[in-house]
C-alpha cells in the first residue's frame, strides 16, 4: 500500500500537498501528490510499495498543519455493485488489517459529499458487522488497535485502508463535533475550544486549564476567546480598545483593559495562558508571541496567524521557523504545534508551551 490520503479544508489542497511532499522528503520517503482543486483531500503516492505505512507510522501526525486526518490506502475500488458493496470492501481489507479497533466510513468535507455522508452513516453498521465476521475488526472498539478507514469519493467508489490510533486524529473525518454555546459573544469561541481539544490531551486538562489560573486575551473584543477561559474559571485580562460583552463582565472574572494588544505589557508574573486572535500580518503577530515567550510572560499560548492569498505553506513555515529560532537563541525550551482547524478559515492556529524542569510533581513548574 503506497498511497496516503490526507483530508484537508477544501481550497487548501495545494498547501496540504506542499507540506506532505516537504515533510515526507525530509524523511527520505519520496513520492508525488495528486491534487484536485476544492476536493477536500490529497493523495500522496509513494514510489516504494511499503512507504505508505512507513510514512503514517514515522512522521508524527501532530507535526502536520494542513491535514485534518490521514490513512494509508490501496487501489481505488470502483463500480461497487449497489446490491452488494460490502463483499468487495471486505475482500480489499482482508490480509491488510487484522483486528482493527474501530471503523470510520468517511467522505471529504465538501457540499457535494453531504448526500454521500448520509449513505456512509447507514452503511457503517452492516459493514462493521461483516468486517468483524471476517476478522478485520475486533468484536469491540479499542483505541489500542489500528483504525480501519473506508473513504468514499463518489457513490460506489472508495478507498480502503487504515491509520494508527496513536498517530492520527481521534475525530471522525478529523473534525471535532462542537456545539456553539448560545451565551458566547461570537462564533470565534469555537476556534479556541477546538484548539484546546486538538493541542491538549484530555487527561491534562485539569492541570493545564485549572480553576483560578490567570490568563490574557489580546485583541479580545467582543470576547469569544475570553468566554472559553471564563468557562474554565480563569481570571482573564481582556485587552482591546473595543468593548467586551456585558455577559462576560458580569461574571466578575474579566478585567477589561482598553489598550492596543501589541503595546500591552503584563504586570503579573504568574500568567498561565495568553491567547490572541488579531487581524494582523502573520510576521507581526509571530514577533509579538516570541516576545511574550522569551520574556516568560506566559506559560502557554494559542494564537492565530492570518494567511496570505499565495504561498501559504511557505508563509506559515517561515513564521514558525522564526519563532523557533527566537526561542533557541534565548535558551527557551518549548513545544510548538500548528494546525488549520475546522473552525479556522484563511488562518492557522498555533500552540506553544514553555517547558521547565519538573518540580514537585508538576510537569512544567518554573
UniProtKB/Swiss-Prot annotation:
Catalytic activity of the protein: cytidine(2498) in 23S rRNA + S-adenosyl-L-methionine = 2'-O-methylcytidine(2498) in 23S rRNA + S-adenosyl-L-homocysteine + H(+)
Active-site residues per Swiss-Prot or TrEMBL entry: 306 (proton acceptor)
Domain of life: Bacteria
InterPro entries: RlmM_FDX, RlmM_THUMP-like, RNA_MeTrfase_FtsJ_dom, rRNA_MeTrfase_M, SAM-dependent_MTases_sf
GO BP annotation list: methylation; rRNA processing
Keyword Cytoplasm found: yes
Residue sites binding S-adenosyl-L-methionine per the record: 188, 221-224, 240, 260, 277
Enzyme class, broadest EC rank: transferase
Annotated compartments: Cytoplasm
The UniProt record lists the keyword S-adenosyl-L-methionine: yes
Keywords of this entry: Cytoplasm, Methyltransferase, rRNA processing, S-adenosyl-L-methionine, Transferase
Protein purpose: Catalyzes the 2'-O-methylation at nucleotide C2498 in 23S rRNA.
Family affiliation: Belongs to the class I-like SAM-binding methyltransferase superfamily. RNA methyltransferase RlmE family. RlmM subfamily.
Subunit structure as annotated in this protein's UniProt entry: Monomer.
Protein name, as recorded: Ribosomal RNA large subunit methyltransferase M
Organism of provenance: Salmonella paratyphi B (strain ATCC BAA-1250 / SPB7)
Gene that encodes the chain: rlmM
Amino acid at each position: 500500500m503506497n498511497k496516503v490520503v490526507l483530508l484537508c479544508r477544501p481550497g487548501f489542497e495545494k498547501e496540504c500537498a506542499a507540506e506532505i511532499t516537504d515533510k515526507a522528503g525530509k524523511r527520505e520517503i519520496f513520492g508525488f501528490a495528486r491534487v484536485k482543486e476544492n476536493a477536500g483531500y490529497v493523495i500522496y503516492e509513494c514510489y516504494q510499495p511499503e512507504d505508505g505505512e512507513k510514512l503514517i507510522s514515522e512522521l508524527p501526525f501532530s507535526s502536520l498543519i494542513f491535514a485534518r486526518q490521514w490513512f494509508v490506502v490501496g487501489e481505488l475500488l470502483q463500480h461497487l455493485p449497489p446490491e452488494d458493496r460490502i463483499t468487495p470492501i471486505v475482500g480489499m481489507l482482508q490480509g491488510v488489517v487484522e483486528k482493527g479497533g474501530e471503523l470510520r466510513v468517511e467522505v471529504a468535507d465538501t457540499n457535494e459529499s453531504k448526500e454521500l455522508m448520509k449513505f456512509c452513516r447507514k452503511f457503517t453498521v452492516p459493514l462493521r458487522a461483516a468486517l468483524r465476521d471476517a476478522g478485520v475488526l475486533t468484536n469491540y472498539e479499542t483505541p489500542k488497535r489500528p483504525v480501519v478507514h473506508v473513504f468514499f469519493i463518489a457513490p460506489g467508489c472508495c478507498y480502503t485502508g487504515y491509520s494508527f490510533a496513536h498517530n492520527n486524529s481521534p475525530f471522525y473525518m478529523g473534525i471535532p463535533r462542537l456545539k456553539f454555546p448560545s451565551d458566547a459573544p461570537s462564533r470565534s469561541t469555537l476556534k479556541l475550544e477546538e484548539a484546546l481539544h486538538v493541542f491538549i490531551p484530555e487527561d491534562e486538562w485539569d492541570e493545564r486549564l485549572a480553576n483560578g489560573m490567570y490568563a490574557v486575551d489580546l485583541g479580545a473584543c467582543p470576547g469569544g476567546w475570553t468566554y472559553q477561559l471564563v468557562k474554565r474559571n480563569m481570571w482573564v485580562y481582556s485587552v482591546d480598545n473595543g468593548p467586551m460583552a456585558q455577559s462576560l463582565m458580569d461574571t466578575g472574572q474579566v478585567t477589561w483593559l482598553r489598550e492596543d494588544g501589541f503595546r500591552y505589557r503584563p504586570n503579573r508574573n504568574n500568567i498561565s495562558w495568553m491567547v490572541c486572535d488579531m487581524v494582523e500580518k502573520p510576521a507581526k503577530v509571530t514577533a509579538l508571541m516570541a516576545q511574550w515567550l522569551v520574556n516568560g510572560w506566559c506559560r502557554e499560548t494559542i494564537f492565530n496567524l492570518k494567511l496570505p492569498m499565495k504561498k501559504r505553506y511557505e508563509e506559515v513555515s517561515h513564521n514558525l521557523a522564526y519563532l523557533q529560532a527566537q526561542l533557541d537563541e534565548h535558551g527557551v525550551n518549548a513545544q510548538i504545534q500548528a494546525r488549520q482547524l475546522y473552525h479556522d478559515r484563511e488562518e492557522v492556529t498555533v500552540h506553544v508551551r514553555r517547558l521547565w524542569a519538573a518540580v514537585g510533581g508538576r510537569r512544567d513548574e518554573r
